[in-house]
């Protein structure tokens, strides 16, 4: 019977710390760090910035000028001359803006349709 008295008590009594004997010291708690005023942490109330939108590749003819020697500049194309004439007209900017909006809306419409088709496939809805 003496052997049974020295055995470890059941776990339920260990959780309640009713076990007679040496107990572990409590875990020390660390003090809170002071907030840095004006530090480099940024404004925590400001929402995070969005990543930049991916843009399509736009070819710029000015990039080719570095490969040309002096005095070998290209003469302006007819389209560029016509654009210069249209800039003088007051309604050119409105027409240009409406045309740009039309192309942007078409691109957005195509992208939304592609995204919705992809979501349908992910959900298992086959067209």
Curated annotation (Swiss-Prot):
Location in the cell: Host cytoplasm; Host nucleus
Region feature Disordered, mapped onto this chain: 1-93
Post-translational modification summary for this protein: Phosphorylated by host ERK. The phosphorylation triggers a structural change that enhances keratin binding and protein stability.
UniProtKB keywords: Early protein, Host cytoplasm, Host G2/M cell cycle arrest by virus, Host nucleus, Host-virus interaction, Modulation of host cell cycle by virus, Phosphoprotein
Composition bias type Acidic residues, residue spans: 79-89
GO cellular component annotations of the record: host cell cytoplasm; host cell nucleus
Gene Ontology BP annotations: symbiont-mediated arrest of host cell cycle during G2/M transition
Subunit structure: Assembles into oligomeric complexes. Interacts with host CDK1. Interacts with host SRPK1; this interaction may favor expression of late viral transcripts. Interacts with host cytokeratin components KRT8 and KRT18.
Family the entry assigns: Belongs to the papillomaviridae E4 protein family.
Miscellaneous section: The major E4 form is first synthesized as an E1^E4 fusion protein from spliced E1^E4 transcripts, such that the first few amino acids of the E4 protein are derived from the N terminus of E1.
Function recorded in the entry: Contributes to multiple aspects of the viral life cycle including viral genome amplification, suppression of suprabasal cell differentiation and egress of newly formed virions. Induces host cell cycle arrest at the G2 phase by associating with and preventing the nuclear entry of host CDK1/cyclin B1 complexes. Inhibits cellular DNA replication by preventing loading of host replication licensing proteins MCM2 and MCM7 onto chromatin. Within the cytoplasm, associates with host kinase SRPK1, a splicing factor regulator, and inhibits its activity.
Descriptive protein name: Protein E4
Organism (species): Human papillomavirus 65
């Amino acid at each position: 019977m003496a052997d049974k008295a020295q055995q470890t008590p059941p776990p339920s009594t260990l959780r309640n710390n009713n076990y007679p004997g040496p107990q572990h010291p409590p875990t020390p708690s660390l003090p809170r760090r002071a907030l840095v005023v004006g530090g480099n942490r940024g404004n925590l109330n400001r929402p995070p910035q969005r990543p930049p939108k991916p843009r399509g590749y736009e070819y710029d003819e000015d990039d080719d000028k570095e490969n040309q020697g002096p005095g070998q500049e290209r003469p302006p194309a007819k389209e560029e001359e016509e654009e210069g004439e249209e800039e003088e007209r007051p309604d050119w900017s409105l027409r240009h803006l409406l045309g740009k909006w039309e192309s942007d809306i078409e691109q957005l419409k195509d992208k939304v349709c592609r995204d919705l088709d992809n979501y349908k496939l992910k959900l298992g809805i086959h067209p």
